[in-house]
From Swiss-Prot:
Enhances NF-kappa-B transcriptional activity by regulating the nuclear localization of the NF-kappa-B subunit RELA and promoting the phosphorylation of RELA by PRKACA. Regulates the effect of the cAMP-dependent protein kinase signaling pathway on the NF-kappa-B activation cascade. Its main location: nucleus. It comes from the Eukaryota. One of its GO terms (biological process) is substrate adhesion-dependent cell spreading. Residues 58-80, 136-162 are annotated as: Disordered. GO terms for cellular component: nucleoplasm. It comes from Homo sapiens. This is A-kinase-interacting protein 1. Interacts with PRKACA and RELA. Expressed at high levels in adult heart and at lower levels in brain, testis, ovary and skeletal muscle. Up-regulated in some breast cancer cell lines. Isoform 1 and isoform 3 are expressed in fetal brain. PANTHER family: A-KINASE-INTERACTING PROTEIN 1 (PTHR14330:SF2). Keywords: Nucleus, Proto-oncogene.
Length: 210
């Protein structure tokens, strides 16, 4: 008998909890309807891949239950389906991730390569900053390069009007951990190659007498 009373009391608590949860859910739903945002009117971010179109009309049609009264501030159009909402959210997250990867890949800085390697492996980039002579000119170049890849740097002969003894080229390359083959030279006779294994956080200095 005591067991039956305990079970009944437990069922009563569960029933009241469910009723309270249902009432709170309806209140949240009403507040969400009043604060509805028309996402289709917002501008689609550039570079975002995917389809933001709503589901086909014939998939959203439901049997009409009779004339419905539209409250002020509400729209007559049907809300997007759950799958369309998640697809839109995934597209915005992909766009945000791509912008984050571009930021950390554009400027060589401490921790930037580690961030890109950890969170944006599919967007591998090699960034090169080139300083020529004593001037302030910098050329930045991007090219795809994964661990174990090979990158060749060709150095062309300087112009005759510029003194040869004043020319120096310092090349800074920020890469992901891996093994790389670096070749420098203006032709097949003067090309020099070094194979370097780079670990995470390691800095390697290479000198090529050209």
């Amino acid at each position: 008998m005591d067991n039956c009373l305990a079970a009944a009391a437990l069922n009563g608590v569960d029933r009241r909890s469910l009723q309270r949860s249902a009432r709170l859910a309806l209140e949240v739903l009403e507040r969400a309807k009043r604060r509805a945002v028309d996402w289709h009117a917002l501008e689609r971010p550039k570079g975002c891949m995917g389809v933001l179109a709503r589901e086909a009309p014939h998939l959203e049609k439901q049997p009409a239950a009779g004339p419905q009264r539209v409250l002020p501030g509400e729209r007559e159009e049907r809300p997007p389906t759950l799958s369309a909402s998640f697809r839109t959210m995934a597209e915005f997250m992909d766009y945000t991730s791509s912008q984050c990867g571009k930021y950390y890949s554009s400027v060589p800085e401490e921790g930037g390569a580690t961030h890109v390697y950890r969170y944006h492996r599919g967007e591998s980039k090699l960034h090169m900053c080139l300083d020529i002579g004593n001037g302030q000119r910098k050329d930045r170049k991007k090219t795809s390069l994964g661990p174990g890849g090979s990158y060749q740097i060709s150095e062309h002969a300087p112009e005759a009007s510029q003194p040869a003894e004043n020319i120096s080229k310092d090349l800074y390359i920020e890469v992901y951990p891996g093994t790389y083959s670096v070749t420098v030279g203006s032709n097949d006779l003067t090309k020099k190659t070094h194979v370097v294994a780079v670990d995470s956080g390691q800095s390697v200095d290479l000198v090529f007498p050209v």
